[in-house]
Structure formats: structure tokens, C-alpha cells
Amino acid sequence: VACRHVAGWDVGGVNTKVAHVDGGELASVCGRPFELQRAPGRLVPLLRELASEAGCPTRDVDVVHGVTMTAELSQMFRTKREGVAFVLDALEAAFPSSEVQVFAADGRFLAPPDARAEPLAVAAANWSATAHLVALDHPGALLIDIGTTTTDIIPIVGGLVAAQGKTDPERLASGELVYTGALRTPAEAIASEIPLRGERVGVSAEGFAIAGDAHLWRGDLAPADYTVPTPDGRPATKEFASERLARVVCADREMLDETAISLVADALARAQVQRVAAAIRRVVARHPWIDVAVVTGLGAFLAEAAARAAGLKVVPLGDELGDAAARFAPAAAVALLLARRRSAAEPEVVGPTSREPRAPSPESRAASSEPRAASNEPRAASSESRAASREERVERREPRADLVVKIGGGLLALPECLDGVLSIL
């Protein structure tokens, strides 16, 4: 059943984000830093506050809610099953008269009872939501999403999400999940030693600084982007970031000048780029025809540098979705994908190898300004751009899916260029 208003949620352990789709167009995105394990009882009122902030109708019955999550990994839960159930309980308590749909890593939307029965199918599936959205416009690409804590490296082949892993342990094993992010990663988890004054200096393992301090000092993040508590409890400013960075090598600002602080920050940033670039090469080795990366997330600047280091061309998702929405990509993706599934004009296509309806063109997507700490509102598309988007979808709806062959118990998508070879065989 079609529904004009769709809310897409990305409920994480330290951030909760929502995107509002109105009539098939992205109307607004907003989010708030929120450490779930510090105040779990605040989640229900927070969901209501964010829905209101995003401009969702006040009557629950007028909104369909789609959700993806990573909050189930919080240490407050003994199992992921328990965490998934907690998040779904909170959504149903916040919006008791609304329909809730849960995004699964394989691209399905599940009703809450089914999601509770298959917790590993929906746990930490936000990467897949973004990948499914990107696949609509980029049938052969590598999605690189660097957030506050982790990096997702997802291959898209023949318009299909071709991730080797589905769960976090599988993705860590495949190189498609890298535990380094633009904000929360401790300095000692980035590098064990750094070059300083002509020597290799060991890095302390005391939690003195995090990635956000290096990127704040370098100017790649603004103080408003530093949305987690600092390691020392002092403000998120360049001055205090420099003090935290000095302690990485057990020094202080009386011992290290600005040049030395820059050496520490640059070494940490460089180590992150090198690690992500190595993971990119590993994933691309399985799909050597991929030559373009779609980059997004708070750490898009790191993703771009790593992609270029790995020899890929770069397309910022923000150029197509808007900068604000791109920072909240999983929430925006869930909302847009669910809206398309529920649209009477675009019937649902089911199955792990089916091609989703195509997304609106970049011209018809909402443009947005640089995100504020809490809320961003992309401009609504004009009626002319919506009409152009509909015409473009009609013109582009016919391209055939790349060949999908069955090998053993699995499915493999082959590039269109191999059709001729297979027909000869």
C-alpha cells in the first residue's frame, strides 16, 4: 500500500538519525548524538523528538517507519537478538499506530515479528541499505562509507550488492568492514608508531586521543562534527586537540610545537588512508572491472584519499543526494527504498538477484546545505524536476540486468560483456 510519508531510521549505539520522505522525495534529514547504553530509557522520547524535528506528521497512522540499526552491538546487550528486540520495542512504543518495516542485509523489508525471529538478518545492516540505494544509479562501483567508527567497502556488480559477507564477523573476514572511523577510533588502534623528528616513536596505549583529534587539527573536521565526548573531557577545539595529540607520544604542548603536532596528526591520518586503501585493493581484486568509488560518510575525505590511492575514480554521494543526506546515508536510503517499495507506481520486485526500481536522477533529488549538529533540511524538488525524474525513470527502466548464473547453491552476477563468451560456449 502506498504511503505519502516514510521515515527512515538508522539507530546506532552513539548516534540516531532519521530521514523523512514526502511523496517520494527526500524532504529532510536530522540526527542527534545519543549513547544508548548511558540512557536506554531516553530512546523512545528521542525517536518522537526526531520524528517531529524531521517534519513527520503527528498522526502515527500517516507514517510508515523503516529502520536499520547498529545499536544491537552495544555492550548493554548480552546478544544481538536482545539488542534487535530492544530497538524494535522502542520504535513500536514511540509510534504505536504506525507500520514498522525492518531492513535486512539481503535487501528485504521484514515485519517486526519476522525481524525478531531473524535477528542476524537485520543486525548491523545499515551498510546494505546505502549499497542498495547506490546500486540503483551505479551498477558497477565500490561504495566506501567511512563513519564515526567504521568503514564499509561494498562492491556493486551488475546493479546488485555483491558483498561477500552479511554479518559483521563475515565482513571483517572479507575486508568489507574495517574498524577505523573519522572520529571515535583511538590513536593506538590507528598506528603503533609514528615518525617524529627523524625517528620512529612508539604510540602510547592510554586512550589519550582519538581520530577526531587528528582530523580536527588538520581541518578536515569542524568542532561541530566532534559529536562524542573527548578523551580528556575538555572541549573539542584545535587547542585542546593538540594537547591530546601530544600525549599520544607521552609529551605535552611545552615539549611539542605546532609542527610536531602536525607530524603526529598527519601520521595518524596517513595510517588510516593506507589501511583503508589496502582493504579497497583486497575487495577490488575480487571484482577487477570496478574502477569507480562512490564515497560518503563523515569521513568521506578519508574515503576519497584511500580510493584515489587504490587507483579508483571518485564520485561523492553528496553530489547526488545532497551533503546532509549523504552524511545520514543509511537513514536516507531506508526511507527512499521503502517509499519506492510502497509506491503504487513502482511495484515491488522481490528476490536476492532482482533489480530495484531506479532512483530519481540527481537533478530531482533534494539539494541540501552542510549539516548542522542536529538538523538539516534538503530543499524539496520542484514539480518540473519531479516530472523530469518520472520521464527519466521511464526512459531508463528497460536496461536488462547483467547475466545471473547459478553455481552450486549460490548466485553469481556476470558483467554484460561476458554474454558473448558464454553464448559461444
Predicted features along the sequence, with ranges:
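Conserved Rossmann-like nucleotide-cofactor binding loop
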Residues: V14, T149, G410
